[in-house]
Amino acid sequence: MTPRRSLSSSDSNDKSPSVSVVAKKARSESVEGIEKKTTPGRVKKIRSEVCTTIVKAGEFDSVALRKVNSLPSPNSEKSDTKTEQEVTIIENSKIPEEVKEFGVCQEMIVSAKSNENEQIDNGDQEIGDQDDYEEDGDEEEEREVEKKSVDVKEINVAKENRVGGVEIKKFSQFQNRTSPSPSSVRKISPPVIKRATSVYSAPPNSTSSTDRFAEQEDNFTHSQSKLQSLVDLVMWRDVSRSTLVFGFGTFLIISSSYANDLNFSFISVVAYMGLIYLGLMFVLKSLIHRGMVEEERHKVVGVREEDVKRMLRLIMPYLNESLHQLRALFSGDPSTTLKMGVVLFVLARCGSSITLWNLAKFGFLGAFTIPKIFISYSTHFSAYGNFWMRRFRDAWESCNHKKAVALALFTLVWNLSSVTARVWAAFMLLVAFRYYQHKMIWTTDQADDDEDDNEEEEAEEEKEQVPPKHKRAPPHMMMPNKLKKIS
């Protein structure tokens, strides 16, 4: 039996790690020596020397030796056990130019079966030679070697995941038997190689615009739902819940009105609460949790960023809605400015007699009564307002001395009012004048639009009333020869 050299390629779907095979100078010389030598003992000796040189150089990562029982040959008369020793050598090397071009690794298999071009003696006649007894006991067992193979797998290697060249050599030894079939040889699991991969971590603020829009929409709907629940409570849409809240608040207001001996300051309240908390903490630490004071000193005490964000998420919807309403009230529109000017002036003049507690009481009662009453009886209030406005307008139009009455009223108010009231009155007169101008412009524009609409409607009606004129058909010309038939 003679060794042979063959090339093989693995499938592209092979799960083994990508490796590249580069034949070192010493290893290539050893393989050529194996092919040229005739005795297996000499071949084994050369292989052992090469392995010893590689071990000393530190060129490979791991050496694995194991013995595997092989199947007996069908032509043999005795069933002898067959041992297989495989030496796996994995080492990093440089990638040759040919391998870099095609991105694959080559595989070389040297076995005991030789081709016609490469034949060597099997060495069966030299088993009993006296020169082999000079070697060690390991070399005596190696004389019985009949087959020697060097397998190097060919694996497609992805260029982007290539880490380095890896060379694998396998040496197998069998006793006096033919080489087993590939199915009888147990495959060695490939070594696990961890490759350095670049991991890209996306920045925290790299969210897409759609995600941000969806989050904003969810927050907006959530805030709208909260405001809607508050409106339902104030407008008595849920009667049981509104009754409970209004009754409890009214009870607290009435009970606090009769408790005259609860006159205290804010500083006194804070001081008393601090004393109570201090006493509770002293009792808790000294009696209940004794010995835990030193451990808790190292704990971080303070407000975390998550707590602040949570509080802001709760407050922001109400704050944004309040700012939106305030922006509408202070928009600068003449009609809105007249209403807000009167309300703010009254609050400014009477604010000294209004305390925070009184404002809270009147605000609570007004929130549960005024909106409901106004919405329920808005038609009646508008009817009464239009009636009295019509009466005052008729009285003013029927007055013969309008200028004198207006001058007398202005002089009386101006002399009885303070400087602040005079400034406010001048400002309100200017706003009223602008409101009158806007109203007149709006009425004229509306009248022009109404006239244009009326003219268009009249033109359409005239078009519909006038019947369309039918065109007369031209007279037909008849030839005499076509009117009469020849009898």
From Swiss-Prot:
Residues 1-43, 65-86, 113-149, 446-487 are annotated as: Disordered. It is a multi-pass membrane protein. It is found in: Endoplasmic reticulum membrane. GO terms for cellular component: endoplasmic reticulum membrane. Residues 230-419 form the Reticulon domain. Residues 118-143, 446-463 have a biased composition (Acidic residues). Keywords: Endoplasmic reticulum, Membrane, Transmembrane, Transmembrane helix. It holds the Pfam family Reticulon. Residues 26-38 have a biased composition (Basic and acidic residues). InterPro entries: Reticulon, RTNLB17/18/21. Residues 1-22 have a biased composition (Low complexity). The keyword Membrane applies. The chain crosses the membrane at residues 242-262, 264-284, 354-374, 413-433. Coiled coil: none annotated. PANTHER family: RETICULON-LIKE PROTEIN B17, RETICULON-LIKE PROTEIN B21. This is Reticulon-like protein B21. The gene is RTNLB21.
